[in-house]
Amino acid sequence: MKILQVNNVYGEKSTGKLTQQLHWGLLRAGHESVVVYGRGKAVEESHVIRLCPDWYGKLNSLLSRVTGMPYGGCFMSTLYLQRIIRREKPDVVHLQCINGNFVNIYKLISWLKKQRMKTVVSLHAEFMYTANCGHAFECQQWKNGCLKCSNIKKANKSWFFDRTAESWRRMKKAFAGFEQDCIVAPVSPWTEGRAKQSEILKNFRFRTVYNGIDTENVFYWDDKIPEAKTVLNVTAHFSDEQAHPKGGWYLLKLAERMSDVTFLVAGKADNIVNKPSNLHFLGEIRDQKTLADYYRRAAASIIVSQRETFSMPCVESLCCGTPVVGFEAGAPEQISLREYSEFVPFGDLDQLETALRQWLTEKKIDRKVIADDACRMYSAQTMIHSFVEIYGGLSWS
């Protein structure tokens, strides 16, 4: 089979690494594989194509804020992508996360449908079925059609116009009639349950596939790494704003309450002026093996996000033999191994502190057993095998 993946980035950030793992796995298995990505550094790797330079994506991001249409524009790059697909003639096109202002999603879906192209759509966020925001949180409008958005600046970053209703209609029109040639692949049961409530995607076939990681060379248990009795939080962005969806404010408050525990934060962070002395920022850790060592040294990992469609930190932590404690955020409490993790209602610091202290002092765990169980569940090989099955079913249907 020949598979063509499309993603925002390649070889970096969570979806870029997933795309790379899948690409390499397909090649190792004897399949043909091509990756087209929209943003980020140029990669000198065969069968990997960057669609446009970063300035093009930034320009289209700016235009989308003016027009209020988050997934439109990008006419030249969309035509270029269509030419690549025609030239490569793949058996299956796999759309990963494509909300990076490098392709017109409405036009691309409509074109793939018209071509009767066998297509897999991975749901790494909610925008494919909300047609607007990446996380809808408690809003329910996306189910039947967005009207007046009460959170317009965050939902699609529009500066002037509320065109959420138009975006929703365009996305619904693009997907309508594509059910026979397209399979939707959410990354978690939680995301699948949400997508099935949407008028845009509810009539499609679904196959949930967990995100996979490199459990052979990076994320695994190593008893040679000494435990440092720290609590690790891995995040895309740490902020001390209470309303920030990644929940940094709650971790600051928790660290104040647990002054006898050392907390480490890995990820980009705002300039936090007043922070507890027992909380330390490591910055963004790009080297995955270094990150894995921090997981192994930690006594526990902590998740404080308000909403997640998956949770790579949960998976990475468990594969390194480290239990997970956190807030209920949608997917994490569903995809995490229950016997090695615990989640409490979002925002309840009392319950979070109690749970974390129990895992640090009272619960007896075998970290190698945790890692072995997790590696079987979350390996990249498991993910690759699942997608090969999906591709095969589509290409012969």
Regions found by a protein language model. Give the residues of each.
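Conserved donor-binding/catalytic core segment of Leloir-type glycosyltransferases
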Residues: I183-A185, D223-K246, L252-E256
